[in-house]
């Protein structure tokens, strides 16, 4: 669904400014230094105090809400169908993000199925690197999705500010994305819209994949043309039946973009981009490590019999690739790995400094009465 927060400019340090070009030897290995361990334990204790004010599964029950349960603080992003707001619960004081979609626009743009799929997918998933939805509700004009508020902003913003990431940094984010996609695919969910704009960073610098507007539960194959042009696999463009392998193509494009600062098939119009994708010619900058060139050549390939992730061993082939040889996957999943970048969150819980300011407008929320679109959104 083309509903993402506008591209914010991050405030404060970038990847280069934090000197994490040296974030290399053992970057994805667990920590061993005792003093560093003790410092991190103190930081974790402090973080536990902070996160006691954040949504926790054991403290906050998922369910049905109404607009009266929240105080709208400010707009975090705008899109074709509505807005994303930072809100605060009037019951527990915790902060959430509420995604609001205008029913009329969703129906007009023929996005009803995608919108219902998004609700269904978010209700199903629970993973450290995926956004969490707490509940939904609706009024006569809008539908509302209550989700975690992730303060660190978009990976897109950090990438544009940094221009491109050093090899180990791109590897870190790619590895967390792989674990998230692996989980989705194990539940027969294709994500179909992987891009930096849909990857948020939490306050510690770990990823959260958001915006499930194109996600779909698929047992075998599907045919729908959807996604963002630069990241779409060739089989989607040619309207051939496709499966989870399209996400691994997009992963390859994402890794390329993180390392180069631009996508491999970029052009001035979607049609020209599609032409380049179908031609399949990828030019690798000379500073790309040979291992990542080998990996990308096996991800960004139209030949599904060669695209790793789509072969008999599935995602294990990607995780076993030499480019990921340093990764301790179990530690990464447990978030027991140092992150290359911690967002400069200065105002504590509810900080919005990493999101752009938007003019606030009169909101038509909470209106009751006749609902001509009720039949389309019965599950909300």
UniProtKB/Swiss-Prot annotation:
Binding locations of ATP: 76-84, 99
EC number, as in UniProt: 2.7.11.11
PROSITE patterns per the UniProt record, alphabetical: AGC_KINASE_CTER, PROTEIN_KINASE_ATP, PROTEIN_KINASE_DOM, PROTEIN_KINASE_ST
A matching Pfam family: Pkinase
GO MF entries: ATP binding; cAMP-dependent protein kinase activity; protein kinase activity; protein serine kinase activity
The keyword Methyltransferase belongs to this UniProt entry's keyword annotation: no
UniProt xrefs under Gene3D superfamilies: Phosphorylase Kinase, domain 1, Transferase(Phosphotransferase) domain 1
Keywords carried by this UniProt record: Acetylation, ATP-binding, cAMP, Kinase, Nucleotide-binding, Phosphoprotein, Serine/threonine-protein kinase, Transferase
Residues covered by the AGC-kinase C-terminal domain: 325-380
Modified residues (Phosphothreonine): 224
Keyword Nucleotide-binding: yes
Protein name per Swiss-Prot or TrEMBL: cAMP-dependent protein kinase type 2
Organism of origin: Saccharomyces cerevisiae (strain ATCC 204508 / S288c) (Baker's yeast)
């Amino acid at each position: 669904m083309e509903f993402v927060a506008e591209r914010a400019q991050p405030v404060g340090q970038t990847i280069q400014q934090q000197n994490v070009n040296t974030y290399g030897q053992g970057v994805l290995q667990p920590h061993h230094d005792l003093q560093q361990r003790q410092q991190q334990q103190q930081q974790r204790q402090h973080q536990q105090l902070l996160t006691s004010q954040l949504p926790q599964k054991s403290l906050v029950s998922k369910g049905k809400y109404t607009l009266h349960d929240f105080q709208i603080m400010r707009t975090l992003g705008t899109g074709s169908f509505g807005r994303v707001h930072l809100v605060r619960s009037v019951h527990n004081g915790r902060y959430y993000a509420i995604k609001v979609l205008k029913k009329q626009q969703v129906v007009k743009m023929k996005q009803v199925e995608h919108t219902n799929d998004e609700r269904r997918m978010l209700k199903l998933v629970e993973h450290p690197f995926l956004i969490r939805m707490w509940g939904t509700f609706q009024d006569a004009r809008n539908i509302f999705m209550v989700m975690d508020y992730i303060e660190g902003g978009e990976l897109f913003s950090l990438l544009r500010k940094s221009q491109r990431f050093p090899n180990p940094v791109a590897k870190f984010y790619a590895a967390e994305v792989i674990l998230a996609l692996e989980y989705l695919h194990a539940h027969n969910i294709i994500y179909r819209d992987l891009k930096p704009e849909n990857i948020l960073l939490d306050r510690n610098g770990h990823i959260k994949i958001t915006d499930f507007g194109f996600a779909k539960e698929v047992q075998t194959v599907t045919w729908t043309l959807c996604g963002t042009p630069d990241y779409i696999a060739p089989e989607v463009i040619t309207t051939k039946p496709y499966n989870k392998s399209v996400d691994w193509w997009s992963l390859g494009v994402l890794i390329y973009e993180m390392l180069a600062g631009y996508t491999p098939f970029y052009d001035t119009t979607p049609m020209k981009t599609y032409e380049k994708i179908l031609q399949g010619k990828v030019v690798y900058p000379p500073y790309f490590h040979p291992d990542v060139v080998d990996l990308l050549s096996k991800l960004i390939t139209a030949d599904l019999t060669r695209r790793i992730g789509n072969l008999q061993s599935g995602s294990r082939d990607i995780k076993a690739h030499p480019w990921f040889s340093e990764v301790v996957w179990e530690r990464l999943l447990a978030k027991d790995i140092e992150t290359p970048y911690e967002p400069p969150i200065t105002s504590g819980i509810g900080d919005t400094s990493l999101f752009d300011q938007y003019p606030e407008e009169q909101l038509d929320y909470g209106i009751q009465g006749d609902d001509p679109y009720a039949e389309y959104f019965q599950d909300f």
